[in-house]
Amino acid sequence: MTALGAMSGTSLDGVDAAVVETDGLAIFGFGPVGYRAYSPEERAVLRAGLGRWAGPEVEAAGDLVTRAHAQALAGFEGVDLVGFHGQTLAHEPRGRGTLQVGDGAALAAALRRPVVWDFRSDDVQLGGEGAPLAPFFHFACAKWIGATEPLCFLNLGGVGNLTYVDPSFERPEVPGALLAFDTGPANAPVNDLMQARLGLPMDEGGAVARGGTVETGALELFLAEPYFSRMPPKSLDRNDFAEMIGLVSELSDSDAVATLTGMCAAAVAQGMEHCPRPPARVLVTGGGRHNPVLMEMLQVSLDCAVEPVECVGLDGDMLEAQAFAYLAVRVARGLSTSCPGTTGVGALVGGGMVSLPDEA
């Protein structure tokens, strides 16, 4: 099948779109990609909805997400179905649940194609974390690149996600094939601080962090958070570590950004200790791989090669969008999308609902 996946991540930068050829098991090829950036005004609308479960801010964010995705996906042709993640505004798997806004039924009507959406709710309702959901796709990617030794995929978006893959197993559902969890905050605290202090959306190229020094006292307080002592699988909301900025409030701009960047790397290093076997390499995806300071910190902290996924022919900007294209096909075929090793759910779960164009 030819599937089009779309992802609007916690970094709030825009909509990624990508085509994957797959049967929901193997990857046969990758197709065209696209990107639709959010304007500063649109990012402000999304930020206003973060951490909320209902109300006008949530409705405004949902309308924006649906409209932006319709624009981002309209130009793709020859697509059998669409995988639509939506925008996560709130995520409390042990509390109120999970909320991704955006109307999949309206999107199906606009695109005149079936849309698979609401990927996380079933997993959470059945006791899982609802995240990460990309690991089944990461397993397929490991097979596609011909990996023979255990490896990790590290996604550095607003939140960091780690997937440990043992490609010696034939299927991702087999116990031991996958372990996945959120490592901790990644780009989100840096982006928020850059916006608040300097009016910039991110630390471009790690330039601000490069001029600073990591404050070890703040780093130690950060690593003492209970989340890091929990065994995986486990997941985070974008705002779970909002107090991080308070830990660096008295520091200079450069020291504050360097410290938040160091916190991301330290959280990954601590999370890697949970891997069943030492991975041969860590393949980094997401916006964080463009930050050379963060990549250097990771390489110093880890005992294996740390490389962008482009080193193996994958597209680090589009991997999550590709993941939801792949997962959409799995949903359409009645295959599972999460398992105990990825979200902690008690059994295999095939999440996601399908909206057809004539249902809207």
Curated annotation (Swiss-Prot):
- Spell out the Pfam families in the cross-references: AnmK
Which InterPro entries does the annotation name? Anhydro_N_Ac-Mur_kinase, ATPase_NBD
* Enzyme Commission number(s) from the entry: 2.7.1.170
Binding positions (ATP): G9, T10, S11, L12, D13, G14, V15, D16
- Annotated pathway: Amino-sugar metabolism; 1,6-anhydro-N-acetylmuramate degradation; Cell wall biogenesis; peptidoglycan recycling
Keywords of the record, alphabetical order, are:
ATP-binding, Carbohydrate metabolism, Kinase, Nucleotide-binding, Transferase
Its EC top class is transferase
Q: Which GO terms describe its biological process?
A: 1,6-anhydro-N-acetyl-beta-muramic acid catabolic process; amino sugar metabolic process; peptidoglycan turnover
Q: Which reaction does it catalyse?
A: 1,6-anhydro-N-acetyl-beta-muramate + ATP + H2O = N-acetyl-D-muramate 6-phosphate + ADP + H(+)
**Record Gene3D superfamilies:** 3.30.420.40
**UniProt keyword annotation of DNA-binding present:** no
List the Gene Ontology MF annotations in alphabetical order. ATP binding; kinase activity; phosphotransferase activity, alcohol group as acceptor
Q: Does the keyword Coiled coil apply?
A: no
PANTHER family, per database record: ANHYDRO-N-ACETYLMURAMIC ACID KINASE (PTHR30605:SF0)
Function of the molecule:
Catalyzes the specific phosphorylation of 1,6-anhydro-N-acetylmuramic acid (anhMurNAc) with the simultaneous cleavage of the 1,6-anhydro ring, generating MurNAc-6-P. Is required for the utilization of anhMurNAc either imported from the medium or derived from its own cell wall murein, and thus plays a role in cell wall recycling.
Q: Which family does it belong to?
A: Belongs to the anhydro-N-acetylmuramic acid kinase family.
Q: Which NCBIfam families match?
A: PRK09585.1-5
Quote the protein name from its UniProt record: Anhydro-N-acetylmuramic acid kinase
Q: Which organism is it from?
A: Ruegeria pomeroyi (strain ATCC 700808 / DSM 15171 / DSS-3) (Silicibacter pomeroyi)
